[in-house]
Amino acid sequence: MEEKRRRARVQGAWAAPVKSQAIAQPATTAKSHLHQKPGQTWKNKEHHLSDREFVFKEPQQVVRRAPEPRVIDREGVYEISLSPTGVSRVCLYPGFVDVKEADWILEQLCQDVPWKQRTGIREDITYQQPRLTAWYGELPYTYSRITMEPNPHWHPVLRTLKNRIEENTGHTFNSLLCNLYRNEKDSVDWHSDDEPSLGRCPIIASLSFGATRTFEMRKKPPPEENGDYTYVERVKIPLDHGTLLIMEGATQADWQHRVPKEYHSREPRVNLTFRTVYPDPRGAPW
């Protein structure tokens, strides 16, 4: 009997100890919101928020926006910019030629002017100008590496229009570049009428007949922009049938202009640009 008890004690020594049942301990938690007074919860949150420090950070990059184009569509004299070069000014005279007479002039010019499509050169690449042109004047005229030969045989209608513009504006002109935009696909790209033969601050008188086209202008960027026109000032001028536009002052030095293609169908448009050409650029007023 004693031997059995001894063996039982030895076997029990090798047995794994009995795990005691874990007694769940209550977790330490904040008091239930149900036991808090109204508003106490928000005060606690407010206390935590007030402990946070607000740090203002300067924006890393300044956002630049291109200015909205200025639209000029009423009669008047407009100073569009002032720079060390001088004042850039445009004068708009809608209805300079009444509609009935303008209709007759458009028909005469489309039929009688010796229109020709010329080949231009830009960046050593030749291209067909997307419009027809003609030149009148005692002297040749060169632009975009195109030379217009002298043509002293003014059409009577053109001479009459030149005289009328001179009488009404006080300016005088000796030459005329004519442009025929046959449809919405014809255009003229960005440029300035700043050839040396025109002298300093040339005055350009532009008279339009036919379909209304938008005359766009953009200011030349300052040197620090490295030729980027993204943020420059812009002007849009709708040129209607019989409208006269005068560009004077520093407009050609400080601005570029163009007549862009249109998305919608357009009837023909004739544009007459009167100017003064000097025989020797060295003798031109600079």
Curated annotation (Swiss-Prot):
Keywords: Cytoplasm, Dioxygenase, DNA damage, DNA repair, Hydroxylation, Iron, Metal-binding, Nucleus, Oxidation, Oxidoreductase, Ubl conjugation, Vitamin C. Changing residue 181 to A: Strong decrease of activity. It is found in: Nucleus; Cytoplasm. The modification (4R)-5-hydroxyleucine is found at residue 177. Substrate binds at residues 115, 141-143, 194. Activated by ascorbate. Its EC number is 1.14.11.33, 1.14.11.54. Ubiquitous. Detected in heart, pancreas, skeletal muscle, thymus, testis, ovary, spleen, prostate, small intestine, peripheral blood leukocytes, urinary bladder and colon. Binds 1 Fe(2+) ion per subunit. Residues 21-45 are annotated as: Disordered. Changing residue 275 to A: Loss of activity. One of its GO terms (cellular component) is mitochondrion. One of its GO terms (biological process) is cell population proliferation. Ubiquitinated; undergoes 'Lys-48'-linked polyubiquitination. OTUD4 promotes USP7 and USP9X-dependent deubiquitination of 'Lys-48'-polyubiquitinated ALKBH3 promoting the repair of alkylated DNA lesions. Disulfide bonds: none annotated. Belongs to the alkB family. This is Alpha-ketoglutarate-dependent dioxygenase alkB homolog 3. The gene is ALKBH3.
